[in-house]
Amino acid sequence: MFSPDQENHPSKAPVKYGELIVLGYNGSLPNGDRGRRKSRFALFKRPKANGVKPSTVHIACTPQAAKAISNKDQHSISYTLSRAQTVVVEYTHDSNTDMFQIGRSTESPIDFVVTDTVPGSQSNSDTQSVQSTISRFACRIICERNPPFTARIYAAGFDSSKNIFLGEKAAKWKTSDGQMDGLTTNGVLVMHPRNGFTEDSKPGIWREISVCGNVFSLRETRSAQQRGKMVEIETNQLQDGSLIDLCGATLLWRTAEGLSHTPTVKHLEALRQEINAARPQCPVGFNTLAFPSMKRKDVVDEKQPWVYLNCGHVHGYHNWGNKEERDGKDRECPMCRSVGPYVPLWLGCEAGFYVDAGPPTHAFSPCGHVCSEKTTAYWSQIPLPHGTHTFHAACPFCAHQLAGEQGYIRLIFQGPLD
């Protein structure tokens, strides 16, 4: 979980606030992680604070005056109320916080570039033709530089001119204390799990976060003009396992503390080798099955285990029970005669998605990603935003919508006959 430098010199390790992991990727982007575009992003304490906090409010601005203020070499948020009036809130440097920005833009203010997740996509080209719904400057996370290093999330990010513009059509309003606030077009949704991110976790309620970090119930649809009700007892403070939805991609927030209890990639590799050492066999061909190495996680191997999703019986690939008159991938299991999809099994390699370090005994349906029982049980009950107003459970390793009664199955391996 840690870079070699950190393992060798723990005293020199910079403070890690946490990590953001994009749901739908199994350890890296399909074509590999490059620069600021990757499947996970670690937030470390910066050498020098770059956080900002609100200061002066300019209320009755003409568009020209608003432009003059926002052209200053400091951060500002502009709320356009009408063609004649704009409220500009200036932001000043905050030496106690670090700011990290997330969005689709590749411009320099964005620390973590996020593109739309296409379920099961094998290459970045699969995602390019889709019209993106992720904002170019989607959100910002502000981390306290001093213990306990609290992280808070806010909708919208500052652009290259250090501005955030909320146009006439954006939902915005004046708060009871005379300040301004607003929502971005497609919104930033957050869900904090109950009982943290552990094997006892339960899903929380999805909320929308405003530009100023206030918490609201969801709008009727993603981009509706009318905001939801303010939820005053909840905050924008991220906790281990919080989910952040940017309308096109969902991110999992893991704290440094939470990650220290997560299985390492080495541990997952040891579990893989343990399964393979037991020499599971195909009940039809009697050939030994083996999960391919984590590096080869998207090319079907000849020894790869396959599973009948209706019953969980694990086989090697064979043509038994493959009747042409059946639609699609449905096959009859030779062991119990149940008919259903027959798919290859893949190990879940993204350790940050695991809620425990249990053995890989269960698989998500219909994709065949394998992980611990508690991890499949957890993700199968999490409703993830899909489109503009629907929610469904999905596999965290590939973003495929889960199917079947539970969304996952217990795997039944046959050991060697000798």
From Swiss-Prot:
It comes from the Eukaryota. The modification Phosphoserine is found at S121. Pathway: Protein modification; protein ubiquitination. Residues 13-200 form the FHA domain. This is E3 ubiquitin-protein ligase pellino homolog 1. The lineage of its organism: Eukaryota, Metazoa, Chordata, Craniata, Vertebrata. Changing R104A: Loss of ability to ubiquitinate RIPK3. Loss of interaction with RIPK1, IRAK1 and RIPK3. Its EC number is 2.3.2.27. The modification Phosphothreonine is found at T127. Expressed at high levels in normal skin but decreased in keratinocytes from toxic epidermal necrolysis (TEN) patients (at protein level). E3 ubiquitin ligase catalyzing the covalent attachment of ubiquitin moieties onto substrate proteins. Involved in the TLR and IL-1 signaling pathways via interaction with the complex containing IRAK kinases and TRAF6. Acts as a positive regulator of inflammatory response in microglia through activation of NF-kappa-B and MAP kinase. Mediates 'Lys-63'-linked polyubiquitination of IRAK1 allowing subsequent NF-kappa-B activation. Conjugates 'Lys-63'-linked ubiquitin chains to the adapter protein ASC/PYCARD, which in turn is crucial for NLRP3 inflammasome activation. Phosphorylation by IRAK1 and IRAK4 enhances its E3 ligase activity. Phosphorylated by ATM in response to DNA damage, promoting localization to DNA double-strand breaks (DSBs) and ability to mediate 'Lys-63'-linked ubiquitination of NBN. One of its GO terms (biological process) is T cell proliferation. It is found in: Chromosome. It is an enzyme of class 2 (transferase). Interacts with MAP3K7. Upon IL1B treatment, forms a complex with TRAF6, IRAK1, IRAK4 and MYD88; this complex recruits MAP3K7/TAK1, TAB1 and TAB2 to mediate NF-kappa-B activation. Direct binding of SMAD6 to PELI1 prevents the complex formation and hence negatively regulates IL1R-TLR signaling and eventually NF-kappa-B-mediated gene expression. Interacts (via atypical FHA domain) with RIPK3; preferentially binds to the 'Thr-182' phosphorylated form of RIPK3. Interacts with RIPK1 and IRAK1. It catalyses: S-ubiquitinyl-[E2 ubiquitin-conjugating enzyme]-L-cysteine + [acceptor protein]-L-lysine = [E2 ubiquitin-conjugating enzyme]-L-cysteine + N(6)-ubiquitinyl-[acceptor protein]-L-lysine. One of its GO terms (cellular component) is cytoplasm. Keywords: Chromosome, DNA damage, DNA repair, Phosphoprotein, Transferase, Ubl conjugation, Ubl conjugation pathway. Belongs to the pellino family.
